[in-house]
Amino acid sequence: MFVAASTRCFSNLPLDAALQRLVDLEYTAVEIALDESGGHLKPSQVAQHLEKAVQICRRTQRLTPVAYSVEIQADSEAQYYAQFDACCRLAKATKVNTIAVRSEELGTPFNAEIERLQELVRLAAKEGVVVGLVTESGRMTQDPATAAVFCKNVKGLALTLDPSHYICGPHQGAPFEQVMEHVCHVRLRDSTKDCLQVRVGQGDVEYGRLLGQLAKQHYTRALTADIQPLPDLDQASELRKIRLLLESLL
């Protein structure tokens, strides 16, 4: 395992500046956000200008890209899958093998979500990329049992584990071991049952226990700091603290 950080940690800065801040904080690996609603690079831009997107994502200032976080807002199903396909080709061109995607919102028919995930996995597999479905409150993966069922029903699907949503969400800190065997990517911040993000060291995330559970499943990939910019929060200090904390446990 190794420590990384998401460009979402500096979503208020241009991509070049966000990457430089992460370098200054001594990170060596990065998850890059491709988000239509405000990421550093939009999936529609990737689809329209793939080669330009590849060039941008290769200029990472000594940071190694380890995952893309993809959030698409398309007018049609065909456009949605075309943009996702372009993101997969970007991943292959930049030697990234993980794409994190969100599950659909609660209330979506289970079979419809299975069909969507099957198509995403099919497109990703063509480029040698793994789809990691994010565990998230308010969405179909908010229940760890359901998240595990998705992986069992969609061959090749994995999970992006965000344990904060199992601590703060409806799960309220109950065990979630059943998802561990399916994890391909991890996002971390400190959280309590009442607040998704608190200062590092003031939350309920048991980092040592979590890393032990991942190690039992032979997980060797990124532990990605994903701390959102907030008013009155020293972002640099928080990112430095979580990096040092995670590195001390490895």
Segments from the language model and where they lie:
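Glycine-rich, proline-tolerant flexible connector loops at the mouths of alpha/beta enzymes
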Residues: E31-Q55, G107
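A general secondary-structure boundary signal
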Residues: E26, A33, Y80, G128-V129, ...
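Active-site beta-loop-alpha junctions enriched in small/polar residues
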Residues: S6-F10, A33-S37, V70-Q73, E104-L106, ...
